[in-house]
Swiss-Prot record:
PROSITE patterns xref list: RIBONUCLEASE_PH
Organism for this UniProt entry: Pseudomonas putida (strain GB-1)
UniProt xrefs under HAMAP family: RNase_PH (MF_00564)
Residue sites binding phosphate per the record: 87, 125-127
Top EC group: transferase
Protein name: Ribonuclease PH
Subunit structure: Homohexameric ring arranged as a trimer of dimers.
Length: 240
């Protein structure tokens, strides 16, 4: 089996995390997984949704979108169509669930964190790149809140989180699929994990033949290997 990119089966794409990419948001990152590029921002606003009023905890919610020409052919903006597509809704819910799992909401205080992930160039793995980049932006936003005198109850961050894709390509488990692999893979799996080694979400779909238990275990092992490398990259970015 030869991957289109020439990478080894267990090799990540080149990953770059650029902090403070925009000047207005409390946290902002440009994350690059190979040719996939996503701008992730975290904005802080006072108050919480109505269903959390008086409960003494904060909230985090996420939105996701793709620029019209982030792909090979221009896609119509969802705003001009008047509604979000099912894929968009699924991905932004995944991003929100994943990031909320990193936080103790009772320590946030009466604030809402708005996470925005905008894909400026897509080459596979946009949802996993969004989660990985948004986590770093979230850390920067929390630092800003603390500097402003917030987080009196302590640090709400329980652990780092990151995400990566794995799949079965030409009968072999591979790590971090780009678009040519993703479009031809027999199985596509998106994995979200904590830096403590726990799983937050595993999304898997067979595109044709079912995958076997040994395939699933091989893909999870690759995801864990890749995730350890990604956590190191996140920490290195935050140390700059």
């Amino acid at each position: 089996m030869k991957r289109p990119s020439g990478r080894a089966a267990d090799q990540l794409r080149s990953i770059r995390i650029t902090r403070n990419y925009t000047k207005h948001a409390e946290g902002s990152v440009l994350v690059e997984f190979g040719d996939t590029k996503v701008i992730c921002t975290v904005s802080v606003e006072n108050g919480v949704p109505r269903f959390l009023k008086g409960q003494g905890q904060g909230w985090l919610t996420a939105e996701y979108g793709m620029l019209p020409r982030s792909t090979g052919e221009r896609n119509q903006r969802e705003a001009s169509r008047g509604k979000q597509g099912g894929r968009t809704l699924e991905i932004q819910r995944l991003i929100g669930r994943s990031l909320r799992a990193a936080l103790d909401m009772s320590k946030l205080g009466d604030i809402t964190l708005y996470v925005d992930c905008d894909v400026i160039q897509a080459d596979g793995g946009t949802r996993t790149a969004s989660i990985t980049g948004a986590m770093v932006a979230l850390c920067d936003a929390l630092a800003v809140i603390k500097k402003r005198g917030g987080l009196k109850a302590g640090n709400p961050l329980k652990h780092m989180i990151a995400a990566v894709s794995v799949g079965m390509y030409q009968g072999e488990a591979v790590l971090d699929l780009d678009y040519p692999e993703d479009s031809a893979a027999e199985t596509d799996l998106n994995v979200v994990m904590t830096s403590a080694g726990g799983f937050i979400e595993v999304q898997g779909t067979a595109e044709g033949a079912p995958f076997q238990p040994e395939d699933f275990n091989a893909m999870l092992a690759l995801a864990q290997k890749g995730m350890n490398e990604i956590f190191e990259l996140q920490q290195a970015a935050l140390a700059d």
